[in-house]
Amino acid sequence: MDFALLPPEVNSARMYTGPGAGSLLAAAGGWDSLAAELATTAEAYGSVLSGLAALHWRGPAAESMAVTAAPYIGWLYTTAEKTQQTAIQARAAALAFEQAYAMTLPPPVVAANRIQLLALIATNFFGQNTAAIAATEAQYAEMWAQDAAAMYGYATASAAAALLTPFSPPRQTTNPAGLTAQAAAVSQATDPLSLLIETVTQALQALTIPSFIPEDFTFLDAIFAGYATVGVTQDVESFVAGTIGAESNLGLLNVGDENPAEVTPGDFGIGELVSATSPGGGVSASGAGGAASVGNTVLASVGRANSIGQLSVPPSWAAPSTRPVSALSPAGLTTLPGTDVAEHGMPGVPGVPVAAGRASGVLPRYGVRLTVMAHPPAAG
């Protein structure tokens, strides 16, 4: 820009209305702080690197790390020096502004010259102010030249201060293709893992829902039907036993279920054999004859079935003769306490009277036998 073409009013106004040198000095202080931090970082980085490689970490890996990190330390030192130079240049620009500011006339002085010139011209009726007007114009020309010179000097100093050494970025110390290779390796490693997880998930789902279990559970109906059939057969058996009095007439079912102490050999149809072979007597003639008679009786009844009521039964089902038994020894069984003897047959169904040969007072009974126990002292 040609500052000589601009009047002093413009140059003075630009110089006095700007931000001044304060911003340049603040920038210089910031560059000084940055230069100090970079220098400190470079020293600490170099110290740690030297201690690590010399004392704690040795070998090819340590040497490779030191060779790779050394350029970065150099870049820190170089950048710190350039930053310090920038701060110096900023101060130089601030100094150039201060000099130009001091050389530039204040705008009020220039304005006063113009006001004086106008007053002289207004009162110059007879030419008496011609010399004063010329002096005022000369003074204004000097102001013009002074402001132009100040601006030219400031432009030159500012241009010199703006000549800075460009900053350079740090050199790449890592492998640029390392991230790509790492991503590829991770992808290659995760693909089989994802396939394995999917396979395991499918296998677990197949285990939790087995295919051999039907969805309608109809097979349970057959199980329940079989159970019901078994229950019906048990009910029929109980009905027949209660109707014909098989327990009392045959003497083969539920023998001694009421009281074991009242069971006798006659209840099983072997009373005569037991009496014939009683201890101390040996086998007597009567016993032998009895046995023979028993055998002859069986042989004589071949081909003819015994009858109980209207029912034909085998000969071995004859009603046995019973007799009272003697009391058991203290070491034997004792009479179990119980309730009254229940009647035969099912409730509501008439039964057949007990055979006359059963002299024992023991009668068969059905249902649950209730037992009353005394209250023990330990229960409180």
Swiss-Prot record:
Changing residue 65 to T: Resistant to 3bMP1 compound. Defective in uptake of propionamide, glucose and glycerol, and is unable to grow on them as the sole carbon sources, but grows normally on hexanamide. GO terms for cellular component: cell outer membrane; peptidoglycan-based cell wall. The keyword Aminoacyl-tRNA synthetase does not apply. It comes from the Bacteria. Changing residue 204 to P: Resistant to trehalose analog 6-azido trehalose, but not to 2-azido trehalose. Normal growth on trehalose as the sole carbon source. It is found in: Cell outer membrane. One of its GO terms (molecular function) is glycerol channel activity. InterPro entries: PPE_C (IPR022171), PPE_dom (IPR000030), PPE_sf (IPR038332). The keyword Transport applies. Its main location: membrane. Induction: By glycerol supplementation as the sole carbon source in the minimal growth medium. Small molecule-selective channel required for the uptake of nutrients across the outer mycomembrane. Transports glycerol and glucose. Involved in sensitivity to M.tuberculosis growth inhibitory agrichemical 3,3-bis-di(methylsulfonyl)propionamide (3bMP1). Transports maltose and lactose disaccharides. Belongs to the mycobacterial PPE family. This is Transporter PPE51.
